[in-house]
């Protein structure tokens, strides 16, 4: 049976990092999103109890160790990138949602780089990059997560779990962190691609940069009927939300 998720009544807007003060990811109430989806069946769990299972380590060169215990993926610190890629059954390329909890346990850079399929390409959500604060999609029209309209600066606490949700539709990508809509990106007519060695994480992968992290409650759920936006997509505008120190 289809499950119905109601996500609010208005769109969320991303903002350029240079126009947005650093703030805590959970300082503000959730921004309503104004769309509904019907899920095509239950969510699929992507982590086993004690082994990598359908995941395999990425040979980045100089990477740390990755392992699974108690349904939690631990990604160790490497010289640069460390991560795993999906080596299991075929994945959807649109109309699906990835969800997980992630935390940084050591290091100062991104603790959740999630590579995922988008139509005929792939994209990567960066959480906590560029010295620990940048959130964004890499790449949009060849611009990475630090320099496109999805770029935001948020503060993240070490050893704190953050709920991360990525919804991929044929025409847009939506990202929530702790139920706060942080990215609403129109991808029609845009070039979606990956930056550098994250291409080794396809078709789906999880990675960190010089950072130790843990991922748990990782699921994938297909979407049966994505709702259309209640109004035409509007370009991102600078955030007017106050920062909280």
Positions of the model-derived regions?
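Short carbohydrate-recognition loop motifs
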Residues: 64-82
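Beta-strand-rich interaction surfaces with strong enrichment in secreted/lumenal proteins
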Residues: 84-90, 150-156, 204-205
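Extracellular beta-strand elements of beta-rich domains used
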Residues: 100, 218-220
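Carbohydrate-binding surfaces in secreted/extracellular proteins
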Residues: 163-189, 218
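Flexible glycan-contacting loops in extracellular carbohydrate-active proteins
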Residues: 185-214, 237-238
């Amino acid at each position: 049976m289809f499950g119905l998720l109601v996500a609010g009544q208005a769109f969320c807007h991303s903002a350029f990092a240079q126009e947005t003060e650093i703030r805590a990811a959970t300082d503000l109430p959730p921004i309503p999103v104004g769309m509904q989806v019907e899920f095509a069946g239950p969510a699929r769990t992507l982590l086993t109890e004690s082994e990598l299972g359908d995941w395999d380590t990425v040979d980045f060169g100089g990477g740390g160790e990755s392992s699974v215990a108690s349904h939690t993926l631990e990604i160790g610190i490497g010289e640069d990138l460390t991560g795993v890629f999906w080596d299991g059954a075929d994945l959807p390329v649109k109309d699906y949602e990835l969800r997980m909890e992630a935390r940084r346990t050591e290091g100062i850079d991104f603790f959740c780089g999630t590579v995922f399929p988008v139509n005929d390409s792939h994209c990567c959500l960066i959480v906590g990059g560029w010295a620990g604060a940048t959130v964004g999609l890499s790449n949009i029209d060849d611009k990475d997560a630090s320099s496109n309209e999805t770029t935001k600066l948020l503060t993240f606490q070490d050893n704190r779990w953050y709920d991360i949700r990525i919804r991929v539709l044929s025409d847009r990508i939506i990202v929530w962190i702790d139920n706060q809509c942080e990215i609403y990106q129109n991808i029609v007519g845009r070039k979606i691609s990956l930056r550098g060695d994250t291409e080794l994480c396809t078709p789906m992968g999880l990675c960190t940069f010089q950072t130790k992290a843990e991922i748990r409650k990782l699921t994938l759920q297909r979407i049966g009927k994505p709702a259309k936006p209640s109004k035409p997509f509007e370009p991102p505008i600078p955030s007017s939300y106050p920062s909280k120190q």
